[in-house]
Amino acid sequence: MTENIHKHRILILDFGSQYTQLVARRVRELGVYCELWAWDVTEAQIRDFNPSGIILSGGPESTTEENSPRAPQYVFEAGVPVFGICYGMQTMAMQLGGHVEASNEREFGYAQVEVVNDSALVRGIEDALTADGKPLLDVWMSHGDKVTAIPSDFITVASTESCPFAIMANEEKRFYGVQFHPEVTHTRQGMRMLERFVRDICQCEALWTPAKIIDDAVARIREQVGDDKVILGLSGGVDSSVTAMLLHRAIGKNLTCVFVDNGLLRLNEAEQVLDMFGDHFGLNIVHVPAEDRFLSALAGENDPEAKRKIIGRVFVEVFDEEALKLEDVKWLAQGTIYPDVIESAASATGKAHVIKSHHNVGGLPKEMKMGLVEPLKELFKDEVRKIGLELGLPYDMLYRHPFPGPGLGVRVLGEVKKEYCDLLRRADAIFIEELRKADLYDKVSQAFTVFLPVRSVGVMGDGRKYDWVVSLRAVETIDFMTAHWAHLPYDFLGRVSNRIINEVNGISRVVYDISGKPPATIEWE
C-alpha cells in the first residue's frame, strides 16, 4: 500500500495574479500537495477538497470596485488557516470588517517592512534589524489599493511608511495577510514565510517528493488500467518521455509507444529517441517514418496557424492508423501536465485569448473509444523534470530548451520544404553545440535558429553565391510570458556565423534577433 501523498493539501484560490502558478509551485517545492482553483468555488467544493489551509492569491482587480472578486465566505468559516497575498489580503480585510482604499500611487518594486508585533508567520525571520532591534524584511510590492483599516480582531504585524498594514494577523483564527508577494525571489525570506504557513501553521508534512510521486503514479496507473494495453504518442519531449517511463514501470510490455517521425525534428533526434527508449530502456516502440506525408500536406501553405493545424491533423491521422493496427488497446496515454489543466479550465470561462493554437489540443477521433491515462496531470513542468531524473532519464534531455510541438514547421518561415528543414537542422545544431561549448546553453532560457525564405548575396573564395538566410534567436526569461533577447558575446556570435556559413552549403548570411517579448513573440511563428 503506497503512502497517501495527498493527505495534507493546500487550496489556492486564484484571483488572476500573474504569480499564482508560482505560489503553487512554491508550495509543491515545500513537499506539500496543492491545487489551484478559480476564486468563485462553492462551499461544497471546498468541503470535498478538505484543505489543510487556504491561500488567497493576488490579482489585478480593485477590491474597491463593486463587482470585483471576493473569497467565498466559507473560506473564513472552514476552521483552517488562511493566508491572503496582496489582493487576497485586501479582500480578506474587507470581508472581515476592515477597509481598503485606492492608493494615489501604485507601489511596485522593492520595499523594506518593519516587524512591529510578534506573529507565528514571521517569528525569527529577518533580513536586517533596525537601530532599536526590530526585524526588517526585504519584500516585493506590486499593488495599487491598500488596506487602511484592519478587522477589529486582527493585529498589525509589519508596516512601511507608505503601507501601514504590510502584514496583518489574527493568531487565534490563524488568518494572515501580506501586502507583498512572498512567492517571488525578490522577497528574500518569502519562501521561509510560505514554509512557516504551510508546514508549521497548517501542520502539513512533506509527503510530496519525486520518489513518492512516482510510487503513487505507478499505483494509480495499475489500478486504472489493470492488465489492459495502453498506447502513447512518444515525441521525445519531456512530458511524453516521462509519461512513457512511468507507464513502462507500471505496466511494462502492455505499453506501446508510437513514435511518428514527421521530418520536422532536430538533427538526429529520431535516432536518439529510438536508441534511448528502445535499445537502452527496452520500451516497445513502433517507429512511423512519415516525413513525406507531412511535407506533402504542408506544400504550398504559408500561414503559420494553418501549418500548425495541418501538422496536428496529420499527426492524428497517422497515430489513428497505427492505433487501429494494434489489437485490443483500451487506453490512450497523454503527457498532459497541470498548467494544461489550469489553462483548459480558464479557457472554459471564456476569459482566455488564444495567441497561438496548442498543437496537442483536440486529441483522437471519438470513434476510437479509448479511456484516457494522464499520469502527469497533477504536476508542474519542474516536477516532471525531477521525476524524469529519478526515473533515470538523462539531465541534458530533460533540461533541453523548449521545442515547439509543430517542430521545424514553425521555425521555417512560410512554406515548409525538405531542403529548408535540412539546412535549418544543421545550422541549429551548430548554434546549440557552440552554446554548450561556451557554457552559455544553461545561461539562456531558449535558443534556436529560424530559416528565412529569402536569398542573399554572399562571397565564397573567388565566387559569389546567392543563398539562404537564417536568424539566431536566444532569450532570457523567467516565465516565458515576457523575455529579453540574450546579450551573447560578439566573438561568440561571430564564431557561430562563420561555422554555419562555412559548413552548411546553402546558407550565405546569419543574423541575430534582438527583439524582446513583447512586442515580438519568442518563436517567429
Curated annotation (Swiss-Prot):
Catalyzes the synthesis of GMP from XMP. It catalyses: XMP + L-glutamine + ATP + H2O = GMP + L-glutamate + AMP + diphosphate + 2 H(+). Residues 9-207 form the Glutamine amidotransferase type-1 domain. Pfam families: GATase (PF00117), GMP_synt_C (PF00958), NAD_synthase (PF02540). NCBIfam families: guaA_Cterm, guaA_Nterm, PRK00074.1. Its EC number is 6.3.5.2. Keywords: ATP-binding, Glutamine amidotransferase, GMP biosynthesis, Ligase, Nucleotide-binding, Purine biosynthesis. Residues 208-400 form the GMPS ATP-PPase domain. GO terms for molecular function: ATP binding; GMP synthase activity. Pathway: Purine metabolism; GMP biosynthesis; GMP from XMP (L-Gln route): step 1/1. The lineage of its organism: Bacteria, Pseudomonadati, Pseudomonadota, Gammaproteobacteria, Enterobacterales. The gene is guaA. One of its GO terms (cellular component) is cytosol. Homodimer. The active site is at C86, H181, E183. This is GMP synthase [glutamine-hydrolyzing]. ATP binds at S235, G236, G237, V238, D239, S240, S241.
